[in-house]
């Protein structure tokens, strides 16, 4: 069973994604805090980490930077999916520097979003 970690401070989105993944057979951990998420990432193994960019305590980019203590840049590009409602040129440029998948919120096509988060 694949293990997914969702880092999202909007509880409705967090819980909706958790239920969708669990229905598809995934094991799912969640966190609303970027700082707590970092601690969890460093001690757990995840097949995919889906991280909102704008968290209440730190940014999703901060989570990725701290994850470099465990993962190589190549691993980060394969494991992380960044979710954001902000797609400014600066955000896109920084996301591209990590070579992570970028998923815009709100999701226009839920099936497509789920595919991008799991492939």
Residue ranges of predicted features:
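The feature encodes the CheY-like receiver
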Residues: 56
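Two-component/phosphorelay signaling modules centered on CheY-like receiver
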Residues: 11-29
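Acidic catalytic/metal-coordinating carboxylates
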Residues: 33, 59-65
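Alpha4 helix (beta4-alpha4-beta5 surface) of REC/receiver domains from two-component response regulators
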Residues: 62, 86-104
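Active-site residues of response regulator receiver
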Residues: 52
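Acidic, metal-coordinating helix/loop segments flanking the phosphotransfer/catalytic sites
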Residues: 30-48
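Conserved acidic carboxylate
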Residues: 8
């Amino acid at each position: 069973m694949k293990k997914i970690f969702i880092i999202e401070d909007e509880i409705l989105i967090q819980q909706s994604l958790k239920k969708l993944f669990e229905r598809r057979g995934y094991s799912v951990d969640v966190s609303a805090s970027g700082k707590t998420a970092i601690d969890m990432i460093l001690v757990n193994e995840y097949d995919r980490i889906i991280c909102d960019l704008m968290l209440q305590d730190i940014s999703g980019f901060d989570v990725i930077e701290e994850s470099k203590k465990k993962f190589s840049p190549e691993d980060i590009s394969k494991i992380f999916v960044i979710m954001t409602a902000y797609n400014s040129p600066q955000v896109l440029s920084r996301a591209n520097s990590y070579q992570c998948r970028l998923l815009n919120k709100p999701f226009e096509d839920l099936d497509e979003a789920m595919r991008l988060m799991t492939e």
